[in-house]
């Protein structure tokens, strides 16, 4: 009854032509629905208190609370709270909270909390948190947290948290943590942490950490840590299974395979007294190289089938003429398969060291011989299974 009385009195007051034109002074807007309210919507009116179910007003300088939604044609300074959505045609300075969406046509300065989507058509300064996505048309500065997605059309700085992806159209400064993908169309300064991949189209200064890969389209100044790391130029550290730079490296690569455009990928076929028949791929740079491969019959040919995978990393130096001297350290994982039923351990590992002498016959073929020492050990206990001198020899195909 009180609300009905206020609506009736407000409506009669608005219809009184002898009074000041409604909406040109700050007022109270109690609203049941669009057009059913104590304050009519015009192009100059201000509202300092709004309560209702669904409200439409020109400008809000104060508090607005609605069951369904609130629509403000120009700007909001204060607090806008709605069960479903808040829409501001201009800029908001203050706090917005809605069950589904907050939409600002221009700037957001303050805090925006939405169950699904938070949108700022131009810039966002402060906190924007949404269950599904946050979207900023131009710049963002502060904290963006989207359940799935953060999108900043141009530059962004601060902390970004997203369940799926964080996308910045230009430069990003700060910390971006995403479940799958971190993407910056320009340069990054700070940290990019992603479950799948980080991509910076320009330079990257700081740390890139990803479960699968990191990509820098310009110069890396810092550290890349992932399964695969790639940069046009690198000044720092690349740590991963596969590391690649295109133009220059002023730093260090630590990985199973370290490559650049001058890396030669070579096929190696060889035999030895550890695993008897072996095939491997050698990734050879000017001085350093890595070898990844596998071999069969770690045990004797008279035993059942056994096999191993190996990785070696070393340094090669030209000796004289067509001869090259190299040395490497290696790790070998050994599977005995059905031999475990005959008393052998099901799997072993071996640590090995080798000195290699290589003779290049032509531009496409070379012969090599290796000697070294190694020992195989149990995974399950601190004991040696076998140890001794290593002897190998074979051919390298360029």
Enumerate the language-model features and the residues they cover.
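Repeated loop/turn-to-beta-strand initiation elements of outer-membrane beta-barrel proteins
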Residues: 61, 91-92, 107-109, 124, ...
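Membrane-embedded beta-strand positions of outer-membrane beta-barrel proteins
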Residues: 51, 99, 113-115, 131, ...
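Residues on the lipid-exposed face of transmembrane beta-strands in outer-membrane beta-barrel proteins
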Residues: 51-53, 227, 239-241, 256, ...
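Residues that define the transmembrane beta-barrel architecture of outer-membrane proteins
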Residues: 45-47, 221, 233, 271-277, ...
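N-terminal targeting and processing segments
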Residues: 16-82, 90-93, 108, 124
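Solvent-exposed loop/turn segments connecting transmembrane beta-strands
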Residues: 57-60, 73-74, 89, 105, ...
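Transmembrane beta-strands of outer-membrane beta-barrel pores
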Residues: 55, 69-71, 85-87, 101-103, ...
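Bacterial Sec-dependent N-terminal signal peptides
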Residues: 1-18
């Amino acid at each position: 009854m009180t609300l009905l009385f206020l609506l009736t009195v407000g409506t009669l007051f608005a219809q009184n032509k002898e009074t000041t034109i409604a909406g040109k002074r700050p007022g109270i807007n109690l609203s049941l629905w669009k057009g059913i309210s104590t304050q009519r919507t015009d192009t100059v009116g201000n509202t300092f208190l709004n309560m209702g179910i669904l409200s439409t007003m020109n400008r809000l300088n104060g508090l607005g609370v609605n069951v369904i939604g609130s629509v403000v044609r120009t700007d909001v300074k204060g607090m806008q709270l709605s069960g479903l959505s808040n829409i501001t045609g201009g800029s908001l300075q203050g706090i917005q909270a809605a069950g589904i969406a907050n939409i600002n046509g221009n700037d957001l300065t303050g805090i925006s909390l939405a169950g699904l989507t938070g949108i700022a058509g131009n810039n966002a300064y402060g906190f924007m948190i949404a269950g599904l996505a946050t979207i900023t048309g131009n710049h963002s500065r502060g904290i963006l947290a989207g359940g799935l997605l953060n999108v900043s059309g141009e530059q962004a700085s601060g902390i970004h948290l997203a369940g799926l992806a964080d996308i910045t159209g230009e430069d990003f400064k700060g910390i971006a943590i995403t479940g799958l993908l971190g993407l910056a169309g320009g340069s990054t300064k700070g940290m990019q942490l992603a479950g799948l991949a980080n991509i910076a189209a320009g330079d990257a200064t700081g740390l890139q950490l990803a479960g699968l890969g990191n990509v820098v389209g310009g110069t890396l100044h810092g550290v890349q840590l992932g399964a695969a790391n790639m940069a046009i130029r690198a000044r720092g550290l690349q740590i991963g299974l596969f590391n690649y730079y295109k133009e220059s490296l002023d730093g260090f690569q630590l990985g199973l395979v370290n490559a650049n455009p001058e890396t030669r990928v070579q096929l190696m076929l060889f035999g030895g007294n550890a695993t008897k028949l072996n095939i491997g791929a050698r990734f050879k740079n000017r001085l350093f190289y890595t070898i990844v491969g596998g071999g069969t019959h770690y045990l004797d040919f008279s035993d059942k089938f056994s096999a191993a995978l190996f990785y070696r990393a070393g340094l090669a130096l030209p000796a004289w003429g067509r001869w090259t001297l190299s040395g490497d350290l290696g790790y070998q994982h050994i599977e005995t398969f059905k031999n475990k039923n005959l008393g052998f351990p099901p799997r072993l590992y071996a640590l090995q060291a080798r000195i290699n002498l290589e003779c290049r016959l032509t531009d496409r073929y070379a012969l090599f011989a290796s000697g070294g020492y190694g020992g195989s050990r149990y995974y399950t206990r601190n004991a040696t299974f076998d140890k001794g001198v290593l002897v190998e020899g074979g051919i390298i195909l360029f």
